[in-house]
Amino acid sequence: DALCLAVLSAQAQQNLAATEGAIAGLSDEMTTASVDDLVGRAVQLFLSSQRHDLTWVMAASELRLYAAREASLRPEYVADVAHMSELFATMISEAAAQCGLTFILPPLEAVSVLQAVYEHTTIMGLIEGAAPDSPAPGDRLAAVFRSMLRPLD
């Protein structure tokens, strides 16, 4: 269980670092670029740091399924996911606010939706035989991300 948690935590830390990098890479443009450009670039930067190979995608999915099956792993897994989700939600909601935007739903729910879209599109791409560098995950993630934003009141 400790090994599974370590791998899942490392994956979450990698995703967090990718998101931080995407936001940092956009910080100079946040007040001048269009929403579509910012979302597109943020998603592109995030995806460029992700591992898309079959082995890694399958291993990550199997680890999550293992957490679902093993009651002893669940409390730590749930706590780790909650912690990482809070960090992601804070990071992306603050970045959105810098652009004069906010989410149409609570940021934690937005993170959950974005994660589900990314995971589903990536896994379905592998099942359907799409190339690892297929634009589909990024296009779908950007479209959903944009659809969850609205101007600040």
Where is each model-derived feature located?
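Secondary-structure edge/capping motif, primarily at the C-terminal ends of alpha-helices
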Residues: 26, 64-68, 121, 125-129
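Hydrophobic core segments within long, regular secondary-structure runs in both alpha-
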Residues: 36-43, 85, 89, 135-146
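Hydrophobic/aromatic-rich alpha-helical bundle segments in the mid-to-C-terminal region
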Residues: 74-75, 95-153
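Short amphipathic alpha-helical segment with a characteristic S/N-K-E followed by hydrophobic residues
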Residues: 1-4
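Amphipathic alpha-helical packing segments from all-alpha helical-bundle domains
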Residues: 16, 51-61, 71-98, 109, ...
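Helix-loop "lid/cap" segments that line or gate small-molecule binding pockets
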Residues: 44-51, 58-69, 148
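Hydrophobic alpha-helical connector segments
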Residues: 6, 13, 17-55, 107-114
